[in-house]
């Protein structure tokens, strides 16, 4: 099959690289220095799956009008703030794409894609896979889970095109599953990245990492308060936690616990992670953006909970204060 990655940064390079290594035909659209390095030296990926040097089945270009031929799947992976610019530049691809999906963070992006390319050509997708650009031609893959990607029709159900992309990801070593309700996966993923990112960026400052905060009572209390409020919204939408991205997901365990029990659970989780990973400490990408002085995705990752809570009439003071803290800093950051 032929894939086109629109926004081949860290995650796009990781996913596209593994697909190409498994024999799929992949076209990357990305920044000039990175694309030139891939053309000249191939793509190097390091991380949880070991070290890989991919040299076959890849075409690297810097603009959509340089991409040739038809594509079975167009995967959108630019930052949320860059979506409109990317779509405007990619109009030349519209007649040549059979199906389109977004692996970006957030809720609601699929409706924008339906407006752009047509309702029937957009499918739902979600991944927790981690990807960071280390330099031109080099990407890190620091995070994965046994099932790292989910695909489904946005109106429900599993079709052949859903099965085909699921099988392609599986062949590439990216554990994937087809699901009947992709919207539930998207919302649960948002709870996961929203709680971790909101907590990390609003509580841990410039020096601390996730595990550092979780092992303290005050840090664990703040995290539990945030998770409980986000899960209240998730429940109000008619969903029950499934731990789609286990073992990273712990919502099925935290959800039924009382506040104090949940705090103890999170503190134990923090101690386990400190012992398990030692000096390999973790921050969310939103927190990293804040530390490095770059615009964050706070409006993509946290604001949907603020808006949905207002719509549903649910009080979420921790979510709201978390959003305000990060948004205030975000106003002064560079794009």
Question: What name fits each language-model region?
Answer:
Residues 1-51:
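NAD(P)+-binding Rossmann beta1-loop-alpha1 motif at the extreme N-terminus of oxidoreductases
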Residues 43-60, 193:
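N-terminal glycine-rich dinucleotide-binding loop that anchors FAD/FMN and/or NAD(P) in oxidoreductases
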Residues 52-140, 150:
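Rossmann-like NAD(P)(H) cofactor-binding subdomain of soluble oxidoreductases
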Residues 69, 109-189, 194-195:
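Rossmann-fold dinucleotide-binding core
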Residues 94-97, 138-153, 201-215, 283-292:
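Helix-loop-beta segment of a Rossmann-like dinucleotide-binding subdomain
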Residues 183-211, 218-231:
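Active-site-proximal catalytic alpha-helix in oxidoreductases
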Residues 224-335:
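NAD(P)-dependent Rossmann-like dehydrogenase/reductase catalytic/cofactor-binding core
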């Amino acid at each position: 099959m032929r894939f086109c990655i629109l926004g081949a940064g860290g995650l796009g390079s990781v996913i596209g690289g593994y697909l190409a290594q498994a024999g799929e035909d992949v076209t990357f659209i990305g920044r000039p220095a990175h694309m030139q390095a891939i053309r000249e030296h191939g793509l190097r990926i390091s991380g949880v799956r070991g070290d890989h040097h991919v040299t076959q089945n890849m075409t690297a270009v810097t603009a959509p009008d340089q991409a040739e031929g038809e594509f079975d799947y167009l995967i959108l992976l630019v930052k949320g703030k860059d979506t409109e610019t990317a779509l405007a530049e990619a109009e030349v691809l519209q007649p040549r794409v059979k199906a389109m999906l977004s692996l970006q963070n957030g809720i609601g992006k699929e409706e924008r894609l339906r407006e752009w390319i047509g309702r029937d050509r957009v499918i739902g997708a979600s991944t927790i896979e981690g990807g960071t650009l280390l330099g031109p031609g080099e990407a890190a893959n620091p995070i994965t889970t046994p099932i790292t990607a989910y695909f489904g029709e946005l109106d429900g159900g599993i079709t052949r095109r859903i099965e085909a992309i699921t099988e392609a990801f599986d062949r590439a070593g990216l554990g994937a599953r087809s699901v009947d309700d992709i919207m539930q996966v998207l919302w649960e993923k948002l709870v996961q990245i929203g709680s971790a990112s909101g907590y990390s960026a609003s509580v841990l400052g410039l020096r601390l990492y996730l595990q550092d905060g979780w092992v303290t009572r005050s840090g664990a209390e703040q995290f539990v308060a945030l998770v409980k409020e986000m899960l209240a919204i998730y429940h109000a939408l008619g969903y029950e936690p499934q731990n789609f991205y286990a073992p990273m997901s712990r919502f099925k365990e935290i959800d039924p616990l009382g506040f104090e029990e949940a705090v103890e659970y999170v503190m134990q989780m923090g101690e386990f992670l400190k012992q398990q990973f030692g000096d390999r400490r973790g921050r969310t990408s939103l927190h990293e953006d804040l530390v490095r002085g770059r615009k964050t995705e706070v409006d993509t990752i946290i604001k949907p909970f603020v808006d949905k809570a207002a719509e549903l009439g649910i009080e979420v003071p921790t979510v709201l204060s978390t959003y305000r803290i990060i948004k205030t800093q975000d106003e002064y950051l560079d794009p």
